[in-house]
Regions:
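Solvent-exposed loop/turn and edge beta-strand elements of beta-rich ligand-binding domains
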Residues: 1-166
């Protein structure tokens, strides 16, 4: 079914992202970053399509304070450990944090992807962010839905410290 294609695509996308990204800690500072989402899928003809009008929410769950990641007040009682930084653990943590955010009705910023399937969350302070798709999006006869995921600003990508993460 089409949902299977969506799940397979998102797993491959997330795994490739997490394989190249590991957690780093930077000194507390005023440097800002961004997270760009490029949302694509495969239609019923197995052709790559840009997924426009997909709504993504972003929550800052931790911030950098004196070279230490500190829980934001609205997430500090979640009792979810972020110590394990493996891809599998991060996937589980993101799902748990998103469920917690929904249960506690935590406010977030929301953006939609454009016709190229892109959106960018800018001016982000150092910390860990939870990103989740709100609902699903259709393209042709296929329906697409992304699993929640975590991104750290800055991130270590292929040996380089990156403040602007795609």
């Amino acid at each position: 079914m089409k949902v299977r294609n969506i799940i397979v695509f998102m797993i491959v996308f997330l795994m490739s992202t997490f394989m190249n990204v590991s957690t780093i800690h930077a000194e507390s500072g005023s440097r800002k970053g961004s997270i760009q989402i490029v949302y694509k899928g495969r239609n019923e003809l197995n052709q790559e399509v840009n997924l426009s009008d997909a709504k993504f929410s972003i929550y800052q769950v931790q911030y950098m304070s004196t070279d230490t990641l500190t829980w934001k007040d609205n997430f500090k009682d979640s009792h979810i450990s972020l110590e394990d930084t493996s891809a599998e653990a991060r996937e589980k943590q993101a799902k748990q944090l998103y469920k917690y955010a929904q249960q506690k009705d935590i406010s977030c910023s929301l953006q939609e992807t454009n016709t190229l399937g892109r959106t960018t969350f800018s001016n982000l302070t150092q910390g860990i962010y939870l990103i989740a798709q709100e609902g699903s999006v259709e393209s042709g006869k296929s329906q697409f839905e992304s699993a929640p995921f975590l991104v750290e600003i800055p991130s270590l990508v292929d040996g380089s410290v990156e403040y602007n993460v795609t």
